[in-house]
Design a protein with these regions (language model features):
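Ankyrin-repeat boundary/linker signal
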Residues: 304, 337-339, 346, 381, ...
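Eukaryote-biased feature marking scaffold/signaling PDZ-domain proteins and nuclear chromatin regulators
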Residues: 31-34, 54, 96-98, 194, ...
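Ankyrin repeat domain, specifically the short helix-to-loop turn at the C-terminus of the second helix
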Residues: 294-299, 325-334, 338-340, 369-377, ...
Length: 577
């Protein structure tokens, strides 16, 4: 595993290839003492990752600012709101300064050649894995791997031993297609998804940073990344889809071995149940005995006491529809509250099997239908007050729940947010938004709790990673959503806003507290605060008023974050003169 020191990386004024860096003696082999930073990025050219030298300075500037303390990397606000409040520690920022970079263009040979040995047909698992990768990447090969094959097949290992994972996703244009590349498009790329999943499956708890600009760095929200299997991504070379399958399979098996050894049973069972979905395989057919063995249950009776991922969740997540009636007849509650210990806090507690089925098993709608047949409650809110409709990922799921008397406008405490707002904030496809509107979901309502809960405002929260954002916004505006509507927080959340104001005035730098003080702003203000320039531009073009103040007297433009948003605002103001 070749690495480039951070000091040498920060001095680069171009993107040298692996061969050039090697020739200059700048690459060093990894040692256990190195603080290794794995860089994942979308290439901006067909034969070169950064032909116009646009990505490189963004990453250099972001690292400089993290090292100096000028910017802080924290969890996104949605994660912070439910208690998943993490930040890059001072020690980790200092480790960056003496760290070492792994980036494909730097550390994988770009000039390929066959290595002087052949596979001997050994049954060894590692050798069999390499044979598969080589045969798919080099179909004309007679069994001799190339130098590049070895490096690509080792990506899970490279991620596993890294101390930090960085997704480099600034908004830039592809040099040959002129199409925009950003976090949304990064999430569609098969190889990027693979690297991302290798990080999530790794035994280490390496921080996952998302770099969107020189001053926009945050810790990734793993909840929304959990439903992006690599094989469903886009590939420039179609045969790479099968290569990724084998690499992902290897990473999954390694993760399961580690989880079983550590006896992290919730995450182990969750991963076993998702195994086929993550690889694009059909649902497994397990008899009762095999079901208990695969999920490591000693008996069905003892499994009833498991508060986390139990038999019902395993059957549901793995798509074993035929097991659900049996479990229902054995006394398992279809609407029970799950308290699981996973590595995604937003998915851990206060959830029901139906919630998870709608969010993660939407590829097999029969699972949710079977839960409903056995009296899963289509209206029962979870601990956050979110009704099952808020987790729908397909129009068919919305229709199914409505047929089971789900209320499309149901709001429950503590959040008091209707399904339409939840779907907008969780990046649901625009078809889901359309179906909710078809069933008379309200686009305007008086807030009962949290500020900024209007659907148009909710779209802004994850606009930078939501490929459906603008299409959904158009649907809402066509349904007569008021582009400048804004309502103050009420009750407990009004008190929370007052406390947040006091904390910010007292010197707190918490981005969550800053948002809470400003959440009475209009959708444009929310978009400016969360820093998505595309959505800001869309709202301005649709006639949003940039001068409407919130409860603190601040206008949307005064809440702007990120250089790209500031650029959009500057262009708008110049055009308006």
């Amino acid at each position: 595993m070749w690495l480039l020191s951070m000091s040498d990386f920060l001095r680069l004024d171009h993107m040298p290839s692996h061969e050039e860096l090697h020739r200059k003696g700048l690459l060093v082999p990894r040692s256990r003492t190195h603080f290794c930073i794995f860089i994942s990025h979308q290439w901006l050219g067909p034969n070169h990752p950064d032909p116009k030298l646009q990505q490189l300075p963004v990453l250099q500037n972001a690292f400089r600012k993290l090292i100096s303390g000028e910017i802080k990397a924290m969890s996104d606000l949605s994660s912070q709101f439910v208690g998943d409040s993490c930040r890059l520690s001072q020690k980790e920022c200092m480790n960056l300064k003496s760290g070492y970079i792994w980036l494909d263009w730097f550390c994988i040979p770009q000039k390929t050649f066959e290595l002087p040995f052949e596979f001997d047909g050994s049954s060894d698992e590692d050798m069999a894995y390499m044979v598969k990768v080589v045969s798919l990447r080099s179909p004309r090969s007679r069994g001799s791997p190339s130098n590049q094959d070895l490096f690509i097949s080792s990506i899970p290992f490279f991620v596993e031993v890294s101390d930090m994972f960085v997704a480099l996703v600034p908004r830039l244009c592809h040099s040959s297609t002129s199409l925009q590349c950003n976090f949304k498009t990064y999430l569609t790329r098969g190889w990027c998804r693979l690297e991302m999943w290798c990080n999530m499956l790794a035994a280490s708890s390496a921080p996952f940073l998302v770099v969107k600009g020189n001053d926009q760095v945050e810790l990734a929200n793993l909840t929304f990344l959990a439903d992006h299997p690599p094989h469903e991504g886009e590939f420039t070379v179609e045969s790479d889809r099968r290569v990724v399958y084998y690499v992902m399979q290897r990473a999954l098996k390694a993760s399961l071995r580690t989880l079983e050894k550590q006896q992290r049973w919730d995450l182990f069972r969750f991963t076993v149940a998702r195994y086929e979905t993550l690889l694009g395989l059909p649902p497994p057919k397990r008899d009762f005995k095999l079901f208990l063995r695969d999920f490591r249950f000693t008996s069905l009776e003892s499994a009833k006491k498991i508060p986390g991922i139990g038999p019902l969740e395993c059957a549901m997540l793995s798509g074993q529809v035929d097991m659900i009636p049996f479990l229902a007849g054995s006394g398992f509650e279809m609407s029970r509250v799950i308290h699981a210990k996973l590595n995604m806090k937003m998915m851990q507690g206060k959830r029901s099997p139906l919630d998870l089925a709608l969010q993660l098993v939407w590829r097999n709608p029969d699972v949710a239908l079977e839960l409903l047949k056995f009296r899963a409650d289509a209206n029962r809110p979870n601990g956050f007050g979110i009704a099952p409709l808020g987790y729908c990922r397909t129009p068919g799921a919305v229709e199914m729940l409505v047929q089971h008397r789900a209320d499309v406008n149901k709001r429950s405490g503590p959040l008091f947010m209707p399904p339409l707002s939840i779907c907008c904030s969780s990046c649901a496809p625009s078809g889901v938004i359309s179906k909710l509107l078809e069933h008379q979901a309200q686009v305007e309502f008086q807030s009962k709790g949290v500020g900024g809960s209007q659907p148009l405002a909710c779209l802004a929260v994850f606009a930078s990673s939501n490929p459906h954002c603008l299409d959904s916004a158009k649907l809402l505006l066509d349904a007569r959503s008021q582009i400048d509507s804004h309502y103050p927080a009420t009750g407990f959340f009004k008190a929370m806003e007052m406390v947040a104001r006091a904390r910010v005035l007292g010197g707190s730098s918490s981005s969550l507290l800053k948002y809470i003080t400003e959440w009475s702003t209009a959708p444009l203000g929310v978009a400016c605060f969360f820093g998505d320039d595309e959505y800001v531009d869309f709202l301005l073009s649709a006639g949003a008023d940039p001068d409407i103040p919130n409860a603190r007297g601040h206008t949307p433009f005064q809440l702007a974050n990120g250089e790209n948003v500031l650029r959009v605002i500057e262009e708008f103001q110049e055009f308006s003169i």
